[in-house]
């Protein structure tokens, strides 16, 4: 199901906007599985390849450009970062996958950390699988999607940096074929941290997790 701001009703958009105008703060970081905290609040996670724009997107929807550290260098996020939104939601920023320019041991550590969290979090309500609009769906993205399905995790696909793509027709076809292969149906959104395209619809979808 392709989703955009027009497809989300006004009530949901308003609820999402109100929630994400609330106070949000960093509450924990985990560099290994033993450091992962157990919150009593519902969690929403952002996962994707290195430099896909996870931190920028989190800053955009939370209206705080300094919340999650942003870098043009892939592999900047080296731990799981947890943010508390108004004592109603925990936003989870996962390390990027697929970054080659780190020692193999570090890369494996990140993969174990990401996989463990996605498999074992008791409060995880929704995973946002971020994919660079300019690059399309890659093998690593498919592996993560398959991991989520195997563990019965609900997810939606977020194409980032949509302002840099003129025609999304090919992407639409690609993602529909991808979902058909997985035998899965979910929201698909196009967002841009620069132009704010899609931010409102994304906030509305995340706000629904409070009642899930």
From Swiss-Prot:
Its cofactor is Mg(2+). The keyword Nucleotide-binding applies. One of its GO terms (biological process) is division septum assembly. GTP binds at residues 48-55, 75-79, 93-96, 160-163, 191-193. The keyword GTP-binding applies. Keywords: Cell cycle, Cell division, GTP-binding, Magnesium, Metal-binding, Nucleotide-binding, Septation. CDD domains: YihA_EngB (cd01876). Residues 40-212 form the EngB-type G domain. Mg(2+) binds at residues 55, 77. GO terms for molecular function: GTP binding; metal ion binding. It comes from the Bacteria. InterPro entries: G_ENGB_dom (IPR030393), GTP-bd (IPR006073), GTP-bd_ribosome_bio_YsxC (IPR019987), P-loop_NTPase (IPR027417). HAMAP family: GTPase_EngB. Necessary for normal cell division and for the maintenance of normal septation. Belongs to the TRAFAC class TrmE-Era-EngA-EngB-Septin-like GTPase superfamily. EngB GTPase family. This is Probable GTP-binding protein EngB.
